[in-house]
Amino acid sequence: MTMDGDSSTTDASQLGISADYIGGSHYVIQPHDDTEDSMNDHEDTNGSKESFREQDIYLPIANVARIMKNAIPQTGKIAKDAKECVQECVSEFISFITSEASERCHQEKRKTINGEDILFAMSTLGFDSYVEPLKLYLQKFREAMKGEKGIGGAVTATDGLSEELAEEAFTNQLPAGLITADGQQQNVMVYTTSYHQISGVQQIQFS
């Protein structure tokens, strides 16, 4: 995803990245393949890129709802406003992490945000428990991409890894404690991706 310095102030704030980091330069997020975000490739008749629409910075609400449904009983239902709230939260979280990663790139005078930058940002922002599992996932992802590129198919590698993290992977439950406003602790179930389905990757353990 390429963010050019020509983007408007409103667009930059929507993405959670200040103008100081993108003014006069651009940052590129590359997943080690040549695939580009088609959204940024659309140009109007004057040759300028279209402004981001609000829905363009959100994950598809159907995908968000599908993940949410995995965390509730089969008979449970989720209201539309709840789905929209989580959809916006996910977008804010992505912008939050990416903004921190872009700051590191800015300090090191780089223009490409890589996987290590994201891991560094998550650690800096207090998401340490996710860093080690994500390091292993990133390693496996790169190995898969490298292996498939060697036999002529980066897309196949991505598809193959996606199959290992398919929808049914969100079935494992991890016990966790939830501290309520009155100081009481409640037991809840946290649904996470089945990291053990990828060789060498372990589940996140909550204490």
UniProtKB/Swiss-Prot annotation:
SUPFAM superfamilies (alphabetical): Histone-fold
Region ranges (Disordered): 27-52
GO terms of biological process kind: regulation of transcription by RNA polymerase II
Post-translational modification: Monoubiquitination at Lys-140 plays an important role in transcriptional activation by allowing the deposition of histone H3 methylations as well as histone H2B monoubiquitination at 'Lys-121'.
Residue ranges, annotated region (A domain): 1-52
Name used for this protein in its record: Nuclear transcription factor Y subunit beta
MF-aspect GO terms: DNA-binding transcription activator activity, RNA polymerase II-specific; DNA-binding transcription factor activity, RNA polymerase II-specific; protein heterodimerization activity; sequence-specific DNA binding
Membership in a protein family: Belongs to the NFYB/HAP3 subunit family.
Region described as Subunit association domain (SAD): 86-97
DNA-binding region: 59-65
Comment text on domains: Can be divided into 3 domains: the weakly conserved A domain, the highly conserved B domain thought to be involved in subunit interaction and DNA binding, and the Glu-rich C domain.
Positions of the UniProt region annotated as C domain: 143-207
Subcellular location: Nucleus
Keyword NAD: no
Region named B domain: 53-142
CDD domains: HFD_NFYB
InterPro entries: CBFA_NFYB_domain, Histone-fold, Transc_fact_NFYB/HAP3, Transcrpt_fac_NFYB/HAP3_CS
PROSITE patterns documented for this protein: NFYB_HAP3
Keywords: Activator, DNA-binding, Isopeptide bond, Nucleus, Transcription, Transcription regulation, Ubl conjugation
Biased composition (Basic and acidic residues): 39-52
Gene Ontology annotations for the cellular component aspect, listed alphabetically: CCAAT-binding factor complex
Annotated source species: Equus caballus
Assembly with partners or alone: Heterotrimeric transcription factor composed of three components, NF-YA, NF-YB and NF-YC. NF-YB and NF-YC must interact and dimerize for NF-YA association and DNA binding. Interacts with C1QBP.
Cross-link named Glycyl lysine isopeptide (Lys-Gly) (interchain with G-Cter in ubiquitin), sites: 140
